[in-house]
Amino acid sequence: MGTWLRSARARLGDWGGALASILLPAPCQVCGELLDSSQRIPICARCLAQFQPLAGPLCERCGRPILSAFAAEISPLLCHMCHRGLYDFDFARSYAEYGPVASRAVLMLKYEQVLPLGAWFAHKLAAAIAQSPADFAADVVVPVPLHAARHRERGYNQAELIARPLARMLGLPFRSALLVRIKPRPDKLKLTIRERWRTVRGAYATRQGAQVDKLRVLLVDDVFTTGATLDACSRALRKAGAVRVAGLTVARVLPPSYSRPDARIVPQGDRPTGSGA
C-alpha cells in the first residue's frame, strides 16, 4: 500500500503539491500568516511589500544612506568610508535595508533552497538599475563566487541564482566562472568588522585564462555588510585589467548609528583629490 501511495504521489507531481497546499496552506516564513496556494515564495504579500528600496540621500559612491540636515548642501556627497578611499570599486548600490523581511528572504535563498527568490531579487535589482543605467553600464555580469568547498557543501551559489536572471533581463553576458574564491571563509558564524576585512584580503582571483582586460563588470552579491567582499573582488578584477567595477546587492546591513545623523560627512573643501582607493 505504501508503495502504491508513493507511486501515485509521484505521478501527481505538481498537482499533488498544489492539492496539498490547498488542504494544508503553508504559513508565511516572516509573520506566520497563511499563504495563498499560488505563491511560489513562502512570504506573504504584506511582508513582501515591506521590501522597499533604500531611501536617500545616499553616498554617491557606495550607496550608504546618509542622514544629515546638511546632505543636500554637500557635493559630491560621500560617506566617511568613501571619503577615506576605502573601497576599490567605482560604484555600488543595495536595493533594500537588511531588515527582518530582507534578512529572512536572503537566508531562505541561501540555506533553505527557496530558489524562486533568486529571480524575484533579480527583478528588484533590474528596477534599481533602470533608475540609474549609466552608473551600471557593464559588459558582463559576474556573481561573487563561493569557495569550491562551500559550493559543494551548499550545492549552489546564491549570488549566481540572482545574477544569472539579472544578466538575462539586462541582455548582458553572464560570466560565473570569471572570478574564483581561492581562500575559504572561516567556519566562525559571526565575524567582527576587522575579521571580515582580513579574511577576504587576497581571497579572490580571476580564473586562469579569463579575458578581463578593459571589461566593465557588474558584480552581484546578496548582502553588503562591510563592503569588504565587493572590495576584494574588485581588486582582483582590476588586477586582471578590468576598467570599471560596479557592485549591486540585494540588501545592505546598516550600522546602529544609521538612526542618528551622520556627523562624519566631510565638506567638499576638506576632501582629498583622487580616488584614494
Name each region found by the language model.
Residues 38-41, 151, 255:
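Glycine/Thr-rich phosphate-binding loops of Rossmann-like dinucleotide-binding domains
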Residues 38, 140, 170-180:
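A short coil-to-beta-strand element that immediately follows conserved catalytic motifs
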Residues 2-9, 14-16, 25, 164, ...:
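PRPP/pyrophosphate-binding module of the type I phosphoribosyltransferase fold
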